[in-house]
């Protein structure tokens, strides 16, 4: 099973009001859930996400890759920046969905890459409220070589084309 099926397995058994997803290569700061709870008390959303960043202990190559993946220059701010060229789509490295969302739109599909973007697109299409919690960041470990990073970006490019076939509005220049 891939990441989508594993997350669905957990969601089918979850009993809480929200299902929270992280990637296995993320480090969650101790204040994360307090930050999310404070935000949800002020403004209830059905789907939320937060940014990812480099931990101070990461290697120089990981920090460089992180910059290329989180800077406005590298992504147009689409990965959780207050400044963005497009709509914010929560991604499963740092994402929470309400039980109502899961029961209405279902879980993640079986795409190997991009299953989280597909879910976020379906959540928007169903009319649910989506929010960015900028202070609910995670430390996301990056690839340790340029070769591994290239492979990751290549796979994401394939995913972007597949997502464009499922959701034409997602296939755009950023």
Cite the ranges covered by each PLM segment:
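Short aromatic/hydrophobic "clamp" motif used to bind/position activated sugar donors
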Residues: 19
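Short, flexible, basic/aromatic active-site loop/helix in glycosyltransferases
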Residues: 50-56, 65-88, 103, 161, ...
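The conserved acidic donor/metal-binding loop of glycosyltransferases
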Residues: 23-27
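Conserved nucleotide-sugar donor-binding
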Residues: 15-16, 94-105
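Glycine-rich, basic loop-to-helix element that forms the pyrophosphate-binding segment
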Residues: 1-14, 35, 85, 92-93
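Short glycine- and hydrophobic/aromatic-rich loop-to-beta-strand nucleating segment
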Residues: 87-97, 117
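Catalytic donor/gating beta->alpha subdomain of glycosyltransferases that bind UDP-sugars
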Residues: 109-171
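Conserved donor NDP-sugar-binding/catalytic core segment of glycosyltransferases
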Residues: 30-63, 136-137, 141
């Amino acid at each position: 099973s891939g990441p989508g099926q594993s997350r669905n397995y957990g969601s089918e058994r979850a009993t809480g009001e929200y299902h929270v997803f992280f990637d296995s290569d993320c480090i969650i700061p101790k204040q994360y859930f307090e930050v999310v709870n404070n935000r949800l008390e002020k403004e209830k959303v059905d789907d939320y996400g937060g940014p990812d960043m480099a931990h101070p202990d990461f290697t120089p190559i990981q920090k460089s890759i992180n910059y290329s993946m989180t800077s406005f220059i590298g992504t147009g701010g689409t990965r959780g920046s207050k400044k963005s060229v497009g709509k914010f789509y929560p991604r499963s490295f740092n994402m929470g969905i309400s039980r109502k969302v899961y029961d209405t739109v279902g879980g993640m599909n079986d795409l190997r890459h991009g299953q989280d973007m597909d879910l976020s697109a379906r959540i928007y299409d169903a009319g649910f409220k989506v929010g960015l919690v900028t202070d609910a960041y995670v430390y996301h470990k990056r690839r340790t070589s340029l070769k591994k990073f290239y492979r990751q970006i290549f796979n994401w490019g394939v995913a972007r084309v597949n997502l464009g076939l499922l959701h034409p509005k997602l296939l755009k220049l950023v």
